[in-house]
A protein has these predicted regions:
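Bacterial Sec-dependent N-terminal signal peptides
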Residues: 1-11
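Structural signature of tandem-repeat unit edges
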Residues: 112-128, 139-170, 181-202, 212-228, ...
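Short, polar/proline-rich extracytoplasmic segments that appear immediately after membrane translocation
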Residues: 9-53
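Register-specific detector for alpha-helical tandem repeat solenoids, activating on a conserved position
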Residues: 134, 173-174, 205-206, 231-232, ...
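N-terminal capping/linker segments that flank leucine-rich repeat
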Residues: 35-39, 44-149, 157, 161-165, ...
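Polar, enzyme-active/binding microenvironments
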Residues: 24, 255, 281, 307, ...
Length: 501
Protein backbone atom coordinates (compact mmCIF):
# COMPACT_ATOMS: atom_id res chain seq x y z
CA UNK A 1 0.00 0.00 0.00
CA UNK A 2 2.88 2.38 0.80
CA UNK A 3 4.28 1.81 -2.70
CA UNK A 4 0.90 2.57 -4.30
CA UNK A 5 0.48 5.71 -2.16
CA UNK A 6 3.93 6.94 -3.12
CA UNK A 7 3.24 6.28 -6.83
CA UNK A 8 -0.01 8.25 -6.73
CA UNK A 9 1.67 11.18 -4.98
CA UNK A 10 4.52 11.30 -7.47
CA UNK A 11 2.29 10.99 -10.57
CA UNK A 12 -0.90 12.80 -9.56
CA UNK A 13 -0.51 15.46 -12.27
CA UNK A 14 -0.10 12.86 -14.97
CA UNK A 15 -3.13 10.93 -13.76
CA UNK A 16 -5.23 14.12 -13.73
CA UNK A 17 -4.16 14.88 -17.28
CA UNK A 18 -5.27 11.42 -18.36
CA UNK A 19 -8.66 12.01 -16.73
CA UNK A 20 -9.04 15.38 -18.49
CA UNK A 21 -8.18 13.88 -21.84
CA UNK A 22 -10.69 11.12 -21.29
CA UNK A 23 -13.47 13.69 -20.95
CA UNK A 24 -12.68 15.52 -24.21
CA UNK A 25 -15.12 14.44 -26.98
CA UNK A 26 -13.69 12.49 -29.89
CA UNK A 27 -12.78 14.55 -32.95
CA UNK A 28 -11.88 17.75 -31.03
CA UNK A 29 -9.02 19.75 -32.52
CA UNK A 30 -5.90 20.26 -30.41
CA UNK A 31 -3.35 23.01 -30.73
CA UNK A 32 -5.36 26.17 -31.43
CA UNK A 33 -7.95 26.79 -28.72
CA UNK A 34 -6.35 26.52 -25.28
CA UNK A 35 -7.67 26.20 -21.76
CA UNK A 36 -5.52 26.01 -18.61
CA UNK A 37 -6.10 23.11 -16.23
CA UNK A 38 -4.74 23.53 -12.69
CA UNK A 39 -3.66 20.42 -10.76
CA UNK A 40 -2.84 19.87 -7.09
CA UNK A 41 0.93 20.16 -7.45
CA UNK A 42 0.57 23.67 -9.03
CA UNK A 43 1.82 22.44 -12.44
CA UNK A 44 -0.18 24.15 -15.28
CA UNK A 45 -0.84 21.89 -18.31
CA UNK A 46 -2.42 23.35 -21.48
CA UNK A 47 -5.05 21.18 -23.16
CA UNK A 48 -6.68 22.03 -26.50
CA UNK A 49 -10.50 21.91 -26.41
CA UNK A 50 -13.20 22.81 -28.88
CA UNK A 51 -14.82 26.22 -28.84
CA UNK A 52 -17.30 27.80 -31.26
CA UNK A 53 -14.90 27.28 -34.16
CA UNK A 54 -16.26 23.86 -35.12
CA UNK A 55 -18.07 25.46 -38.06
CA UNK A 56 -15.92 25.45 -41.18
CA UNK A 57 -17.88 27.46 -43.74
CA UNK A 58 -16.30 28.18 -47.11
CA UNK A 59 -16.25 31.71 -48.48
CA UNK A 60 -17.06 31.21 -52.16
CA UNK A 61 -15.50 34.50 -53.27
CA UNK A 62 -12.15 33.77 -51.64
CA UNK A 63 -12.24 30.21 -52.98
CA UNK A 64 -12.46 31.43 -56.56
CA UNK A 65 -9.78 34.07 -55.99
CA UNK A 66 -7.43 31.38 -54.73
CA UNK A 67 -8.06 29.25 -57.82
CA UNK A 68 -7.54 32.21 -60.11
CA UNK A 69 -4.27 33.28 -58.48
CA UNK A 70 -2.57 29.88 -58.63
CA UNK A 71 0.83 29.98 -60.30
CA UNK A 72 0.19 26.45 -61.52
CA UNK A 73 -3.46 26.21 -62.70
CA UNK A 74 -5.49 23.45 -61.09
CA UNK A 75 -7.15 20.68 -63.08
CA UNK A 76 -8.60 18.83 -60.07
CA UNK A 77 -10.35 20.19 -56.99
CA UNK A 78 -11.14 18.10 -53.92
CA UNK A 79 -13.10 19.06 -50.80
CA UNK A 80 -11.65 16.76 -48.15
CA UNK A 81 -10.94 16.27 -44.46
CA UNK A 82 -7.57 17.50 -43.20
CA UNK A 83 -6.43 13.92 -42.72
CA UNK A 84 -6.98 13.27 -46.44
CA UNK A 85 -4.60 15.97 -47.64
CA UNK A 86 -1.39 14.42 -49.05
CA UNK A 87 1.53 14.98 -46.66
CA UNK A 88 3.66 16.59 -49.36
CA UNK A 89 0.99 19.09 -50.43
CA UNK A 90 1.88 22.75 -50.02
CA UNK A 91 -0.42 24.93 -47.94
CA UNK A 92 -1.42 28.17 -49.68
CA UNK A 93 -1.60 31.37 -47.67
CA UNK A 94 -5.19 32.56 -48.11
CA UNK A 95 -7.73 31.54 -45.48
CA UNK A 96 -10.91 30.41 -47.27
CA UNK A 97 -13.26 30.82 -44.35
CA UNK A 98 -16.52 32.66 -44.13
CA UNK A 99 -16.26 36.11 -42.60
CA UNK A 100 -18.48 35.40 -39.62
CA UNK A 101 -15.82 35.36 -36.85
CA UNK A 102 -17.00 31.87 -35.97
CA UNK A 103 -15.61 29.73 -38.73
CA UNK A 104 -12.37 27.86 -38.30
CA UNK A 105 -9.53 28.33 -40.73
CA UNK A 106 -9.84 26.63 -44.12
CA UNK A 107 -6.89 26.38 -46.47
CA UNK A 108 -6.08 25.22 -49.96
CA UNK A 109 -3.28 22.70 -50.34
CA UNK A 110 -1.61 22.13 -53.70
CA UNK A 111 0.38 19.29 -55.14
CA UNK A 112 0.98 19.52 -58.88
CA UNK A 113 -2.32 20.36 -60.56
CA UNK A 114 -4.40 19.06 -57.67
CA UNK A 115 -5.98 21.36 -55.11
CA UNK A 116 -7.33 20.14 -51.78
CA UNK A 117 -9.66 22.30 -49.70
CA UNK A 118 -9.65 21.27 -46.04
CA UNK A 119 -9.91 22.57 -42.46
CA UNK A 120 -6.54 23.76 -41.20
CA UNK A 121 -6.78 22.57 -37.61
CA UNK A 122 -9.20 19.65 -37.32
CA UNK A 123 -8.46 16.37 -39.03
CA UNK A 124 -12.06 15.13 -39.00
CA UNK A 125 -14.11 18.31 -39.41
CA UNK A 126 -16.52 18.76 -42.28
CA UNK A 127 -16.54 21.72 -44.62
CA UNK A 128 -19.81 23.60 -44.97
CA UNK A 129 -21.05 25.21 -48.14
CA UNK A 130 -22.64 28.62 -47.48
CA UNK A 131 -26.42 28.98 -47.22
CA UNK A 132 -26.29 30.94 -50.46
CA UNK A 133 -24.11 28.74 -52.66
CA UNK A 134 -25.16 30.39 -55.90
CA UNK A 135 -22.18 30.84 -58.26
CA UNK A 136 -20.09 28.67 -55.91
CA UNK A 137 -17.78 27.56 -58.72
CA UNK A 138 -18.79 29.36 -61.87
CA UNK A 139 -17.56 31.44 -64.78
CA UNK A 140 -18.86 34.04 -67.22
CA UNK A 141 -21.35 35.79 -65.02
CA UNK A 142 -21.82 39.33 -63.84
CA UNK A 143 -22.75 40.59 -60.44
CA UNK A 144 -21.21 41.71 -57.18
CA UNK A 145 -20.24 38.25 -55.96
CA UNK A 146 -16.77 38.47 -57.43
CA UNK A 147 -15.06 40.75 -59.92
CA UNK A 148 -12.37 40.08 -62.45
CA UNK A 149 -11.52 37.17 -64.70
CA UNK A 150 -12.10 33.70 -63.27
CA UNK A 151 -11.62 31.83 -66.52
CA UNK A 152 -9.13 29.41 -64.95
CA UNK A 153 -12.04 27.53 -63.44
CA UNK A 154 -12.67 26.39 -67.02
CA UNK A 155 -9.46 24.35 -66.75
CA UNK A 156 -10.83 22.14 -63.98
CA UNK A 157 -11.36 18.58 -65.17
CA UNK A 158 -12.41 17.09 -61.85
CA UNK A 159 -14.40 18.39 -58.89
CA UNK A 160 -15.13 16.03 -56.00
CA UNK A 161 -17.19 17.18 -53.05
CA UNK A 162 -16.84 14.24 -50.63
CA UNK A 163 -16.34 16.45 -47.56
CA UNK A 164 -18.58 19.34 -48.58
CA UNK A 165 -21.61 19.50 -46.29
CA UNK A 166 -24.53 21.14 -48.10
CA UNK A 167 -27.17 20.53 -45.43
CA UNK A 168 -27.50 24.27 -44.74
CA UNK A 169 -27.67 25.37 -48.37
CA UNK A 170 -30.86 27.00 -49.63
CA UNK A 171 -29.66 28.36 -52.96
CA UNK A 172 -27.72 26.26 -55.48
CA UNK A 173 -28.55 28.36 -58.53
CA UNK A 174 -25.58 28.69 -60.92
CA UNK A 175 -23.50 26.63 -58.48
CA UNK A 176 -21.39 25.06 -61.25
CA UNK A 177 -22.44 27.44 -64.04
CA UNK A 178 -20.00 27.23 -66.93
CA UNK A 179 -21.70 29.58 -69.38
CA UNK A 180 -24.40 29.15 -72.03
CA UNK A 181 -22.23 29.67 -75.09
CA UNK A 182 -21.63 26.55 -77.19
CA UNK A 183 -18.19 27.96 -77.95
CA UNK A 184 -17.18 28.02 -74.29
CA UNK A 185 -16.24 24.32 -74.07
CA UNK A 186 -15.13 23.54 -70.54
CA UNK A 187 -12.73 20.84 -69.38
CA UNK A 188 -14.91 19.50 -66.55
CA UNK A 189 -15.55 15.80 -67.16
CA UNK A 190 -16.03 14.61 -63.57
CA UNK A 191 -18.27 16.27 -61.00
CA UNK A 192 -19.11 14.29 -57.88
CA UNK A 193 -22.14 15.70 -56.08
CA UNK A 194 -23.59 12.31 -55.17
CA UNK A 195 -23.41 13.01 -51.42
CA UNK A 196 -25.07 16.41 -51.53
CA UNK A 197 -27.74 17.02 -48.90
CA UNK A 198 -30.27 19.17 -50.73
CA UNK A 199 -33.17 18.97 -48.29
CA UNK A 200 -33.26 22.75 -47.72
CA UNK A 201 -32.57 23.89 -51.26
CA UNK A 202 -35.26 25.96 -53.00
CA UNK A 203 -33.41 27.05 -56.15
CA UNK A 204 -31.47 24.80 -58.53
CA UNK A 205 -31.75 26.99 -61.62
CA UNK A 206 -28.66 27.00 -63.88
CA UNK A 207 -26.98 24.61 -61.42
CA UNK A 208 -25.05 22.64 -64.06
CA UNK A 209 -25.62 25.01 -66.97
CA UNK A 210 -22.85 24.82 -69.56
CA UNK A 211 -21.11 21.76 -68.09
CA UNK A 212 -20.74 20.63 -71.67
CA UNK A 213 -18.03 18.00 -71.16
CA UNK A 214 -19.66 16.04 -68.33
CA UNK A 215 -20.29 12.49 -69.49
CA UNK A 216 -22.09 11.40 -66.32
CA UNK A 217 -23.74 13.09 -63.36
CA UNK A 218 -25.18 11.34 -60.32
CA UNK A 219 -28.08 13.32 -58.87
CA UNK A 220 -30.14 10.24 -58.04
CA UNK A 221 -30.18 10.98 -54.31
CA UNK A 222 -31.06 14.65 -54.54
CA UNK A 223 -33.89 15.62 -52.20
CA UNK A 224 -35.82 18.21 -54.19
CA UNK A 225 -38.88 18.42 -51.96
CA UNK A 226 -38.48 22.17 -51.42
CA UNK A 227 -37.14 23.19 -54.82
CA UNK A 228 -39.28 25.72 -56.72
CA UNK A 229 -36.97 26.59 -59.62
CA UNK A 230 -35.27 24.10 -61.96
CA UNK A 231 -34.98 26.35 -65.00
CA UNK A 232 -31.79 25.85 -67.07
CA UNK A 233 -30.66 23.22 -64.55
CA UNK A 234 -28.97 20.96 -67.13
CA UNK A 235 -28.82 23.47 -70.00
CA UNK A 236 -26.11 22.60 -72.54
CA UNK A 237 -24.91 19.45 -70.76
CA UNK A 238 -24.17 18.16 -74.23
CA UNK A 239 -22.08 15.11 -73.35
CA UNK A 240 -24.54 13.52 -70.91
CA UNK A 241 -26.20 10.42 -72.35
CA UNK A 242 -28.55 9.67 -69.46
CA UNK A 243 -29.88 11.14 -66.22
CA UNK A 244 -31.42 9.29 -63.28
CA UNK A 245 -33.91 11.79 -61.89
CA UNK A 246 -35.74 10.55 -58.84
CA UNK A 247 -36.97 14.08 -58.24
CA UNK A 248 -39.87 15.32 -56.15
CA UNK A 249 -41.02 18.26 -58.25
CA UNK A 250 -44.31 19.03 -56.51
CA UNK A 251 -43.24 22.61 -55.64
CA UNK A 252 -41.41 23.45 -58.86
CA UNK A 253 -42.95 26.38 -60.76
CA UNK A 254 -40.32 26.88 -63.46
CA UNK A 255 -38.91 24.14 -65.70
CA UNK A 256 -38.03 26.39 -68.62
CA UNK A 257 -34.94 25.24 -70.56
CA UNK A 258 -34.35 22.53 -67.96
CA UNK A 259 -32.84 20.14 -70.54
CA UNK A 260 -32.19 22.52 -73.45
CA UNK A 261 -29.28 21.47 -75.69
CA UNK A 262 -28.76 18.15 -73.92
CA UNK A 263 -28.03 16.85 -77.39
CA UNK A 264 -26.39 13.63 -76.19
CA UNK A 265 -29.27 12.37 -74.04
CA UNK A 266 -30.55 9.10 -75.47
CA UNK A 267 -32.86 8.35 -72.55
CA UNK A 268 -34.65 10.57 -70.07
CA UNK A 269 -37.24 9.38 -67.58
CA UNK A 270 -39.48 12.22 -66.43
CA UNK A 271 -42.63 10.12 -66.24
CA UNK A 272 -42.91 10.53 -62.46
CA UNK A 273 -42.52 14.31 -62.47
CA UNK A 274 -45.25 16.12 -60.55
CA UNK A 275 -45.78 19.22 -62.68
CA UNK A 276 -48.95 20.44 -61.02
CA UNK A 277 -47.27 23.68 -59.86
CA UNK A 278 -45.28 24.40 -63.01
CA UNK A 279 -46.09 27.62 -64.87
CA UNK A 280 -43.33 27.69 -67.47
CA UNK A 281 -42.22 24.85 -69.74
CA UNK A 282 -40.59 27.12 -72.31
CA UNK A 283 -37.76 25.30 -74.15
CA UNK A 284 -37.94 22.49 -71.61
CA UNK A 285 -36.68 19.80 -74.01
CA UNK A 286 -35.43 22.08 -76.78
CA UNK A 287 -32.72 20.42 -78.92
CA UNK A 288 -32.78 17.08 -77.12
CA UNK A 289 -32.27 15.71 -80.59
CA UNK A 290 -30.96 12.26 -79.61
CA UNK A 291 -34.10 11.29 -77.71
CA UNK A 292 -36.26 8.85 -79.66
CA UNK A 293 -38.96 8.63 -77.01
CA UNK A 294 -40.14 10.82 -74.17
CA UNK A 295 -42.96 9.98 -71.78
CA UNK A 296 -44.80 13.15 -70.75
CA UNK A 297 -48.22 11.51 -70.77
CA UNK A 298 -48.69 12.05 -67.02
CA UNK A 299 -47.71 15.70 -66.99
CA UNK A 300 -50.22 17.89 -65.20
CA UNK A 301 -50.07 21.11 -67.19
CA UNK A 302 -53.14 22.81 -65.77
CA UNK A 303 -51.10 25.77 -64.43
CA UNK A 304 -48.69 26.12 -67.33
CA UNK A 305 -48.87 29.47 -69.13
CA UNK A 306 -46.16 29.01 -71.73
CA UNK A 307 -45.10 26.01 -73.82
CA UNK A 308 -43.02 28.01 -76.28
CA UNK A 309 -40.46 25.76 -78.02
CA UNK A 310 -41.12 23.02 -75.48
CA UNK A 311 -40.18 20.22 -77.91
CA UNK A 312 -38.43 22.37 -80.49
CA UNK A 313 -35.67 20.50 -82.38
CA UNK A 314 -36.42 17.13 -80.79
CA UNK A 315 -35.34 15.73 -84.12
CA UNK A 316 -35.24 12.09 -83.05
CA UNK A 317 -38.68 11.77 -81.43
CA UNK A 318 -40.81 9.27 -83.32
CA UNK A 319 -43.76 9.40 -80.92
CA UNK A 320 -45.02 11.95 -78.44
CA UNK A 321 -48.18 11.66 -76.37
CA UNK A 322 -49.52 15.06 -75.35
CA UNK A 323 -53.18 14.08 -75.57
CA UNK A 324 -53.70 14.59 -71.82
CA UNK A 325 -52.20 18.07 -71.70
CA UNK A 326 -54.45 20.65 -70.04
CA UNK A 327 -53.72 23.88 -71.86
CA UNK A 328 -56.50 26.21 -70.73
CA UNK A 329 -53.99 28.69 -69.23
CA UNK A 330 -51.37 28.55 -71.98
CA UNK A 331 -50.80 31.82 -73.85
CA UNK A 332 -47.77 30.90 -75.97
CA UNK A 333 -47.43 27.78 -78.15
CA UNK A 334 -45.00 29.26 -80.64
CA UNK A 335 -42.46 26.75 -82.03
CA UNK A 336 -43.82 24.13 -79.64
CA UNK A 337 -43.23 21.19 -82.03
CA UNK A 338 -40.91 22.92 -84.51
CA UNK A 339 -38.28 20.67 -86.13
CA UNK A 340 -39.76 17.44 -84.79
CA UNK A 341 -38.62 15.91 -88.06
CA UNK A 342 -39.61 12.27 -87.56
CA UNK A 343 -42.91 12.57 -85.70
CA UNK A 344 -45.45 10.69 -87.79
CA UNK A 345 -48.47 11.44 -85.62
CA UNK A 346 -49.42 14.06 -83.08
CA UNK A 347 -52.70 14.30 -81.19
CA UNK A 348 -53.47 17.89 -80.21
CA UNK A 349 -57.21 17.61 -80.82
CA UNK A 350 -58.07 18.19 -77.15
CA UNK A 351 -55.92 21.29 -76.72
CA UNK A 352 -57.74 24.26 -75.20
CA UNK A 353 -56.21 27.19 -77.05
CA UNK A 354 -58.66 29.87 -75.97
CA UNK A 355 -55.94 32.00 -74.29
CA UNK A 356 -53.16 31.42 -76.80
CA UNK A 357 -51.85 34.58 -78.47
CA UNK A 358 -48.98 33.08 -80.48
CA UNK A 359 -48.92 29.95 -82.65
CA UNK A 360 -46.06 31.09 -84.84
CA UNK A 361 -43.96 28.19 -86.20
CA UNK A 362 -45.90 25.80 -83.97
CA UNK A 363 -45.62 22.83 -86.36
CA UNK A 364 -42.83 24.10 -88.63
CA UNK A 365 -40.75 21.35 -90.27
CA UNK A 366 -42.75 18.46 -88.85
CA UNK A 367 -41.80 16.91 -92.14
CA UNK A 368 -43.20 13.43 -91.47
CA UNK A 369 -46.63 14.62 -90.34
CA UNK A 370 -49.19 13.72 -92.99
CA UNK A 371 -52.28 14.38 -90.86
CA UNK A 372 -52.99 16.87 -88.10
CA UNK A 373 -56.31 17.56 -86.39
CA UNK A 374 -56.60 21.21 -85.37
CA UNK A 375 -60.30 21.42 -86.21
CA UNK A 376 -61.22 22.28 -82.60
CA UNK A 377 -58.63 24.99 -82.07
CA UNK A 378 -60.02 28.22 -80.61
CA UNK A 379 -57.89 30.94 -82.16
CA UNK A 380 -59.96 33.95 -81.16
CA UNK A 381 -57.04 35.49 -79.22
CA UNK A 382 -54.20 34.48 -81.53
CA UNK A 383 -52.18 37.37 -82.96
CA UNK A 384 -49.43 35.50 -84.82
CA UNK A 385 -49.67 32.45 -87.08
CA UNK A 386 -46.41 33.15 -88.85
CA UNK A 387 -44.88 29.93 -90.22
CA UNK A 388 -47.40 27.84 -88.30
CA UNK A 389 -47.56 24.89 -90.72
CA UNK A 390 -44.54 25.63 -92.90
CA UNK A 391 -42.64 22.67 -94.40
CA UNK A 392 -45.08 20.03 -93.16
CA UNK A 393 -46.07 17.02 -95.29
CA UNK A 394 -49.78 17.48 -94.66
CA UNK A 395 -52.15 16.73 -97.52
CA UNK A 396 -55.14 18.60 -96.09
CA UNK A 397 -55.97 21.00 -93.28
CA UNK A 398 -59.31 21.67 -91.61
CA UNK A 399 -59.13 25.20 -90.22
CA UNK A 400 -62.89 25.66 -90.14
CA UNK A 401 -62.80 26.60 -86.44
CA UNK A 402 -60.13 29.27 -86.94
CA UNK A 403 -61.17 32.81 -86.04
CA UNK A 404 -58.29 34.97 -87.25
CA UNK A 405 -59.76 38.39 -86.59
CA UNK A 406 -56.91 39.36 -84.20
CA UNK A 407 -54.13 37.82 -86.28
CA UNK A 408 -51.62 40.36 -87.60
CA UNK A 409 -48.91 37.98 -88.90
CA UNK A 410 -49.43 35.17 -91.43
CA UNK A 411 -46.06 35.25 -93.18
CA UNK A 412 -44.86 31.75 -94.24
CA UNK A 413 -47.99 30.22 -92.69
CA UNK A 414 -48.19 27.38 -95.27
CA UNK A 415 -44.71 27.87 -96.74
CA UNK A 416 -43.36 24.81 -98.59
CA UNK A 417 -46.29 22.55 -97.69
CA UNK A 418 -45.63 20.85 -101.01
CA UNK A 419 -48.15 18.02 -100.48
CA UNK A 420 -51.02 20.22 -99.34
CA UNK A 421 -54.03 20.01 -101.66
CA UNK A 422 -56.92 21.38 -99.57
CA UNK A 423 -57.35 24.02 -96.86
CA UNK A 424 -60.85 24.19 -95.43
CA UNK A 425 -61.90 27.39 -93.65
CA UNK A 426 -65.02 29.25 -92.52
CA UNK A 427 -65.91 32.88 -93.02
CA UNK A 428 -64.14 33.67 -89.71
CA UNK A 429 -60.78 33.25 -91.42
CA UNK A 430 -59.95 36.86 -92.16
CA UNK A 431 -56.76 38.68 -93.04
CA UNK A 432 -58.20 42.12 -92.37
CA UNK A 433 -55.71 42.93 -89.59
CA UNK A 434 -52.72 41.66 -91.54
CA UNK A 435 -52.17 45.21 -92.73
CA UNK A 436 -48.47 45.07 -93.57
CA UNK A 437 -47.80 43.22 -96.81
CA UNK A 438 -44.58 41.73 -95.40
CA UNK A 439 -46.65 40.04 -92.70
CA UNK A 440 -48.25 37.80 -95.32
CA UNK A 441 -45.11 37.41 -97.43
CA UNK A 442 -44.78 33.90 -98.96
CA UNK A 443 -47.91 32.75 -97.13
CA UNK A 444 -48.56 30.03 -99.73
CA UNK A 445 -45.11 29.84 -101.33
CA UNK A 446 -44.22 26.28 -102.42
CA UNK A 447 -47.75 24.85 -102.00
CA UNK A 448 -47.55 23.44 -105.52
CA UNK A 449 -50.46 20.98 -105.20
CA UNK A 450 -52.86 23.39 -103.52
CA UNK A 451 -56.18 23.97 -105.28
CA UNK A 452 -59.08 26.20 -104.20
CA UNK A 453 -62.57 24.82 -103.70
CA UNK A 454 -63.67 26.02 -107.14
CA UNK A 455 -60.55 24.86 -108.92
CA UNK A 456 -58.17 27.82 -108.64
CA UNK A 457 -54.68 26.26 -108.98
CA UNK A 458 -51.54 27.36 -107.18
CA UNK A 459 -49.56 30.09 -108.88
CA UNK A 460 -46.03 30.82 -107.64
CA UNK A 461 -46.54 34.55 -108.25
CA UNK A 462 -49.72 34.65 -106.15
CA UNK A 463 -48.67 33.62 -102.65
CA UNK A 464 -49.63 36.38 -100.21
CA UNK A 465 -52.80 37.09 -98.17
CA UNK A 466 -54.70 38.14 -101.30
CA UNK A 467 -55.39 34.46 -101.95
CA UNK A 468 -56.35 33.63 -98.37
CA UNK A 469 -59.94 33.56 -99.56
CA UNK A 470 -62.69 30.98 -100.12
CA UNK A 471 -62.39 30.20 -103.80
CA UNK A 472 -65.42 31.42 -105.73
CA UNK A 473 -66.87 33.49 -102.91
CA UNK A 474 -68.09 36.82 -104.27
CA UNK A 475 -66.68 35.64 -107.60
CA UNK A 476 -63.11 35.99 -106.35
CA UNK A 477 -60.25 33.56 -106.61
CA UNK A 478 -58.54 32.00 -103.60
CA UNK A 479 -56.81 28.88 -102.33
CA UNK A 480 -59.34 28.04 -99.61
CA UNK A 481 -62.31 25.70 -99.65
CA UNK A 482 -65.46 26.66 -97.76
CA UNK A 483 -69.15 27.58 -97.73
CA UNK A 484 -70.01 30.08 -100.46
CA UNK A 485 -73.43 30.95 -99.01
CA UNK A 486 -72.31 32.69 -95.79
CA UNK A 487 -71.93 36.44 -95.44
CA UNK A 488 -68.75 37.93 -96.79
CA UNK A 489 -68.43 40.01 -93.63
CA UNK A 490 -66.18 37.20 -92.47
CA UNK A 491 -67.78 36.56 -89.15
CA UNK A 492 -67.36 39.97 -87.53
CA UNK A 493 -69.59 42.98 -88.01
CA UNK A 494 -66.59 45.29 -87.59
CA UNK A 495 -64.13 43.25 -89.64
CA UNK A 496 -62.17 45.28 -92.17
CA UNK A 497 -62.61 44.42 -95.80
CA UNK A 498 -60.05 42.40 -97.74
CA UNK A 499 -58.34 44.16 -100.59
CA UNK A 500 -57.70 42.34 -103.86
CA UNK A 501 -55.61 44.90 -105.68
Amino acid sequence: MKNVSAFLKRHSALLLLVLVLATVPAGIAFGKYVKSVKVTNEISIKVSVATSATNYTIDKTTLKEVLQDLQTPATALYFVKRSQVPVNAKQLETDIKADDNKSGSIFAYQIGNDIYIAPADNVDARLYAPVDSSYFLSINYSGDIISGDISRIKLLKTIKCDNLDTSRVENMSNMFYMGKSKASDTALTTLDVSKFNTANVTDMSYMFCGCDSLTSLDVSKFNTTNVTNMSYMFYDCRALTSLDLNFNTSKVTDMSSMFTDCIGLTSLNVSSFDTSSVKSMTDMFNACNSLTSLDVSNFNTSNVTTMQSMFDACKGLTTLNVSNFKTSNVTDMSSMFQDCWVLTSLNVSSFDTSKVTSMSYMFRKCTELTTLDVSNFNTSNVESMEGMFSACSLTSLDLSSFDTYKVTKMKYMFYNCSNLTTIKVSDKFTTGNVTNSTNSFYMFQGCEKLVGGKGTPYNSSETDKTYAWIDGKDNKRGYFTGDLTTNSVIGHSDAPGISFD
